[in-house]
Amino acid sequence: MLSLEQKMDYNKGHIEEKYNLNDKFLKYLEKEDRVMIILDAYSGSKPFWTKYEKGRVVLTNDTNKDYPAKLHFPAEDLVKVLYEKEYEFDVVDLDPFNTPMKCFDNAIKICNRGLIMTFGDKRGIISNKNLAKERYGCRVYDERKIIQHYIRRAKKFGVKLRVWKFVKWKMTWRVYFKVLTPSSL
């Protein structure tokens, strides 16, 4: 199990690259005709998306009440309630320490331009081969197969995902999806 110190530093070696990609992805998705609405379901101690609040709506969430988030709920519960209340977001960012899988089914239903998913579960899955099959339907932990798993899963909800960018760092990786709904095709 990762120590708290390791968890807090997991972004250290790639944080600037991650933030630069977030900037580029937002510019890629953004249209000037309306305000962008962003959900950061796991915002952490330094919520990245809050710097974009001018001219946009940013909803931050983290279970840790000491963190400067607007809400403090388990992300999977929050995303489920947002779906049930028919909220929609232009961008949904799922960046947990582990896997975003618990949020995916509802997150895909509430985002209409971009979905960002970070996976930090590689270390745990390497030591337990059955987890790759249970979580992602593949025999071994293979990022590209996991991406395909989520693309297929999104289709079940009538949503087409197209990979905009996929990046890997040591035991963590992140995928940026352009969301193609019938209204955006």
Residue ranges and their predicted role:
Residues R113-I126:
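Conserved beta-strand signature within the Rossmann-like core of class I S-adenosyl-L-methionine
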Residues R144-L185:
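Class I S-adenosyl-L-methionine
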Residues M1-G55, T60, T63-V91:
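S-adenosyl-L-methionine
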Residues N98-C111:
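A short, conserved alpha-helix within the catalytic core of class I
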Residues I125-G137:
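Short, glycine-/aromatic-enriched active-site segment of Class I SAM-dependent methyltransferases
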